[in-house]
Amino acid sequence: MAEKLKVELVTPYKKVLSEEVDEITATGALGEFGVLPGHAPFLTSLKIGELAYRKDGVSHHMALNWGYFEVENDTVTVLVETAEKADEIDLERAKAALGRAETELKGLTPEDKNFRIYEAALERALIRVQVAGKAARR
């Protein structure tokens, strides 16, 4: 059994992460899950949420926007629409997006065609604010 997991995280635009890590957690369609070296093969979809990994005793956090997560032979492959490292998130911009989404949602009902769009925008902004806050506390 390997002592580390090889993680490759890719968006349609670039490779965001290529590291050997001790453990990794993410938010799947059915909730949060964690993976350690030696994990059985596994494939799941990801929803808007946080990905966290520990490397050499240090925790790292990222905000993700939809994708897929696969584990095979101590290799983790993460394919996502977008990914932002905690220390790269502009907290003021994320808070502004959160405010805009909240304002738009106040005037809509679940039956409105734009409701789900702003609901997803709100969820993305919340995750970005939470993850950015974790970078500030390092």
UniProtKB/Swiss-Prot annotation:
CDD domains, sorted: F1-ATPase_delta
SUPFAM superfamilies the record matches:
Epsilon subunit of F1F0-ATP synthase N-terminal domain
Please provide an example of a Pfam family that matches this protein in its UniProt record: ATP-synt_DE
Q: How does it sit in the membrane?
A: Peripheral membrane protein
The record's keywords, sorted A to Z, are:
ATP synthesis, Cell inner membrane, Cell membrane, CF(1), Hydrogen ion transport, Ion transport, Membrane, Transport
Subcellular location(s): the record lists:
Cell inner membrane
* GO-annotated cellular components: plasma membrane; proton-transporting ATP synthase complex
Q: Which residues form each disulfide bond in the chain?
A: none
User: Which residues are the signal sequence here?
Assistant: none
Can the keyword Ion transport be found in this entry's annotation?
Answer: yes
Question: What molecular function terms (GO) are annotated for this protein?
Answer: ATP binding; proton-transporting ATP synthase activity, rotational mechanism
- Similarity remark: Belongs to the ATPase epsilon chain family.
Q: What is this protein's function?
A: Produces ATP from ADP in the presence of a proton gradient across the membrane.
Quaternary structure and partners: F-type ATPases have 2 components, CF(1) - the catalytic core - and CF(0) - the membrane proton channel. CF(1) has five subunits: alpha(3), beta(3), gamma(1), delta(1), epsilon(1). CF(0) has three main subunits: a, b and c.
Entry protein name: ATP synthase epsilon chain
